[in-house]
């Protein structure tokens, strides 16, 4: 890397500078994805965390909103750190929080997982790397918690691993972990052994760890510990009564199902457990709820319903620690007609449902429900007449309810996670007095959307966001970005919209495509995405892919992987474009209606007959893969092409190309947005001197500026980017699990190297014995989770004299300029060749 930088300096290439862009979320609102785990601190009021499967960890605020605390650890290399498979709090220290991070245990995630720890409620994190993978987005992710801190000894932490890796223990507060050789159960259940991609063919492993705080201590550690495993054949619940020295299956335990949750009610000296016939989070057709009397060693089946009323398993389990014997359990999954919640105030002897049949198909609701912080949830998922023509009913209460918690300091405060949001409220005890509670969406601040595409039309809608699971959203102006929309893209409403585009000469004309099989997956808007209509010319066999709209809005080009590239003009029938390969990258010239562009492999294509046919264009240097094409929003014939070797530019509709710079290579999504004056900024995710991240150029790619800073966006090959077509210097980034971010700033010419957050982690060493120890490095290591990271000045400073301004170069090999910074900034080393005033 040093060699390439030296060559760049010798050749006079401009290396990116760092610009101070402050990132925040566009408020889609309401969560937008699965929340498999919620945990309250057992003693301190107001301390709680919610874990997501692809969007990281959040901390609860006093106003019921949430703050993301893992953004700073999810850069391109650490994208999998947004998969949170378990979370634990220290009962003796409300500042400490631990999490198991990693996205997949199959080949989709090449990296092993880690246990991260924070002593400041998630402001900074230290890492201990594990010698195996962690599956925050794998089957069984709603079980838990797999991570637990000994209530009698903060140094002792247990982690139940997946994939047959067993039980792990730390005795130094999470700095190192060793395998517990005395615990031999591994949780051998595999959902689908025939699954060749490994997602459903991995062992589910251990499901939870629960300490019995009422037991005595052995050597300063809690003596009784329960562990649940994914095993419905031999035994699934194990116990140690000597602080983990030996383990045995709990006698008399129920078989047949998998234990999803196990929670202790200390006042009763009882363990409550929910069971389902699958490991979740999508399955569940039978299940049960049990109470284990620890002192008596007896089990009692307290399942709320039986017979034909029992067609689901059980997942979420909340105990009221203020009121012994009071608990709430949730169905997993009652896909029809709705989820069901049950509450008991007598240790499960009797139960009260949250809804019941009046006379079919009418339901009697013992609750009210509202979503004021995310209106689209109520408008599109609750207050609708039909979810599907076959049943006419909707799922108001949610689905995939694996996390359900009652605040241990407040019997009225409860939360539960669904596949879309967090519901809950502050009057739970009304269930007992009036048999009616008020439920709200309480996920404000959680932005877990998987963004599929972004667009911003000059003079049109400020932001069009196509998302997974929740279809998409329109923000008419920049003033709307902080307010959750009233509605998702509706009529038609799909689960996922994969692509959206606008017509350059008619910016209120918008087209989108979806990936739901069996129905038309093209929708058209003539009012900038406020309302939509189905394009009935689309064949119901086609779905997914990307879409491009001609400049005048009369021609749709649709590139799919399974049906090839299709073309429709004047909303007529779609016809195959034989001159393009399936799945080709496509774009329209935004000013010339007859011109479209495409790329596949290393070949660039151009059409001058509204996409009817394409011809091969010039070779783009040594590029082997064309990844994206961005046409200039206001200049005909000007376009940029992103490739595995960098970005190429044409000003003659693709007749000739030139590479804009060699400073940025291996680029992915690119976009143009209004810059300062009459300039347009070019934004690109690619690899530069600061690594793989988001860069911007104010001079058509001649120089580049790092505008990402310490904000994590996940892997750059899955991020989306759109420059604002109307707001100078504003740029949008779509992530796979953290929604849409935006920032605004001035992008000038690059004058030096870029600053980037330094990320360090504990290294792991595995011993040859059966007890594998993971050791941290000698120096304590942390990562900032906030947008602005802490930086430490290097001891080896630059040489020279003078005073440099904010973000200016102040040192480096060969530097002869100023070495002091204007107050209050300090000169910090970014690399051997570049020091910067930050």
Curated annotation (Swiss-Prot):
E.C. designation(s):
3.2.1.155
- What are the glycosylated positions? 232, 436
Catalytic activity line of the entry: Hydrolysis of (1->4)-D-glucosidic linkages in xyloglucans so as to successively remove oligosaccharides from the newly-formed chain end after endo-initiation on a polymer molecule
Task: Note the pH dependence of activity.
Answer: Optimum pH is 5.3.
SMART domains (UniProt xref): fCBD (SM00236)
On temperature dependence, the record says: Has a half life of 15 minutes at 60 degrees Celsius.
> Which CDD domains does the entry mention?
Sialidase_non-viral
A GO BP entry is: xyloglucan metabolic process
Where is region (Disordered) located?
750-801
Endpoints of the signal sequence: 1-19
Top-level taxon of the source organism? Eukaryota
The question of whether Signal is a record keyword is answered with yes
> What positions does the domain CBM1 occupy?
802-838
Low complexity: bias regions? 754-797
Q: Which InterPro entries match?
A: CBD_sf, Cellulose-bd_dom_fun, WD40/YVTN_repeat-like_dom_sf, Xyloglucanase_GH74
User: Belongs to which family?
Assistant: Belongs to the glycosyl hydrolase 74 family.
What is this protein for, i.e. what is its function? Hydrolyzes the glucosidic bonds of unbranched Glc residues in tamarind seed xyloglucan, producing XXXG, XLXG, XXLG and XLLG. Has a low activity against beta-glucan and carboxymethylcellulose. Not active against Avicel, laminarin, xylan, galactomannan, linear and branched arabinans, galactan, polygalacturonic acid, starch, beta-D-Glcp, beta-D-cellobiose, beta-D-Galp, beta-D-Xylp, alpha-D-Xylp, alpha-L-Araf and alpha-L-Arap.
Protein name from the UniProt record:
Xyloglucanase
* Source organism: Hypocrea jecorina (strain QM6a)
């Amino acid at each position: 890397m040093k060699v390439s930088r030296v060559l760049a300096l010798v050749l006079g290439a401009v290396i990116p500078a760092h610009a101070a862009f402050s990132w925040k979320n566009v408020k889609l609102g309401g969560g937008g994805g699965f929340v498999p785990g919620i945990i309250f601190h057992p003693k301190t009021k107001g301390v709680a965390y919610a874990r997501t499967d692809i969007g990281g960890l959040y901390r609860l605020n006093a106003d019921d909103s949430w703050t993301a605390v893992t953004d700073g650890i999810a850069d391109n290399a650490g994208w999998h750190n947004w998969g949170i498979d378990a979370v634990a709090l220290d009962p003796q220290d409300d500042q400490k929080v631990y999490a198991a991070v990693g996205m997949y245990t199959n080949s989709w995630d090449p990296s092993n997982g880690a246990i991260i720890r924070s002593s400041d409620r998630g402001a900074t994190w230290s890492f201990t790397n594990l010698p195996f993978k962690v599956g925050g987005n794998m089957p069984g992710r709603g079980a838990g918690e797999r991570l637990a801190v000994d209530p009698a000894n903060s140094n002792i932490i247990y982690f139940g691993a997946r994939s047959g890796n067993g039980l792990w223990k730390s005795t130094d507060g999470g700095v190192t972990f060793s395998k517990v050789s005395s615990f031999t159960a591994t949780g051998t259940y595999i959902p689908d052994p025939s699954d060749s991609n490994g997602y459903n063919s991995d062992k589910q492993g251990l499901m939870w760890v629960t300490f019995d705080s009422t037991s005595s201590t052995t050597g300063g550690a809690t003596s009784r510990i329960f562990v649940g495993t994914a095993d419905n054949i031999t035994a699934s619940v194990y116990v140690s009564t000597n602080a983990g020295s030996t383990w045995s299956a709990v006698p008399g335990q129920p078989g047949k199902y998998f234990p999803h949750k196990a929670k202790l009610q200390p006042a009763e000296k009882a363990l409550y457990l929910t069971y389902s016939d699958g490991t979740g989070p999508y399955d569940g057709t039978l299940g049960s709820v049990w109470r284990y009397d620890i002192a008596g060693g007896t089990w009692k089946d307290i399942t709320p319903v039986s017979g034909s009323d029992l067609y689901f398993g059980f997942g979420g389990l909340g105990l009221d620690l203020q009121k012994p014997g009071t608990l709430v359990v949730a169905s997993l999954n009652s896909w029809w007609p709705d989820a069901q919640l049950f509450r008991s105030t007598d240790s499960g002897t009797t139960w009260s449902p949250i809804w019941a049949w009046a006379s079919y198909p009418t339901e009697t609701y013992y609750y009210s429900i509202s979503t004021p912080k995310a209106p689209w949830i109520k408008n599109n998922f609750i207050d609708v007449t039909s979810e599907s023509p076959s049943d006419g009913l909707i799922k108001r209460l949610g689905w995939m309810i694996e996390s359900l918690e009652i605040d241990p300091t407040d019997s009225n405060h409860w939360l539960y996670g669904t596949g879309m949001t967090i519901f809950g409220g502050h009057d739970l005890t009304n269930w007992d007095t009036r048999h009616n509670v008020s439920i709200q969406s309480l996920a404000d601040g959680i932005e877990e959307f998987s963004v599929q595409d972004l667009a911003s039309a000059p003079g049109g809608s400020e932001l069009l966001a196509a998302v997974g699971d929740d279809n998409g959203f329109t923000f008419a102006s920049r003033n709307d970005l902080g307010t959750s929309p009233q509605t998702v893209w509706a009529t038609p409403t799909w689960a996922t919209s994969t692509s959206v585009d606008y017509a350059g000469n008619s910016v209120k004309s918008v087209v989108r495509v979806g990936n739901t099989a069996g129905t038309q997956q093209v929708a058209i808007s003539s009012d900038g995405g406020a309302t939509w209509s189905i394009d009935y010319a689309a064949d119901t066999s086609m779905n997914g892919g990307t879409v491009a709209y001609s400049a005048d809005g009369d021609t749709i080009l649709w590139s799919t992987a399974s049906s090839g590239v299709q073309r429709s003009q004047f909303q007529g029938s779609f016809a195959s474009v034989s001159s393009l390969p399936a799945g080709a990258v496509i774009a329209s010239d935004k000013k010339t209606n007859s011109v479209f562009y495409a790329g596949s492999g290393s070949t660039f294509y151009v059409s001058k007959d509204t996409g009817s046919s394409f011809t091969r264009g010039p070779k783009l240097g040594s590029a082997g893969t064309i990844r994206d094409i961005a046409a200039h929003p206001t200049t005909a014939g000007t376009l940029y092409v992103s490739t595995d070797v960098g970005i190429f530019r044409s000003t003659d509709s693709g007749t000739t190309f030139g590479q804009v710079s060699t400073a940025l290579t291996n680029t992915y999504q690119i976009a143009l947005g209004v810059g300062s004056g009459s300039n347009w900024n070019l934004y690109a995710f690619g690899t530069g001197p600061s690594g793989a991240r988001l860069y911007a150029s104010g001079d058509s790619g001649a120089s580049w500026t790092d505008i990402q800073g310490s904000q994590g966006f996940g892997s750059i090959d899955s991020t989306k980017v759109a420059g604002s077509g109307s707001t100078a210097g504003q740029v949008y980034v779509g992530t796979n699990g953290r929604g849409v971010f935006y920032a605004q700033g001035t992008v000038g010419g690059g004058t030096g190297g870029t600053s980037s957050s330094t990320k360090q982690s504990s290294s792991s060493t595995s011993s040859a014995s059966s007890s594998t120890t993971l050791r941290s490095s000698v120096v304590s290591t942390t990562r900032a989770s906030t947008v602005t990271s802490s930086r430490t000045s290097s001891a080896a400073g630059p040489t020279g004299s003078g005073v440099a301004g904010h973000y200016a170069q102040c040192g480096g090999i060969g530097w002869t300029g100023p070495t002091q910074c204007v107050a209050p900034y300090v000169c910090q080393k970014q690399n051997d060749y570049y020091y910067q005033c930050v």
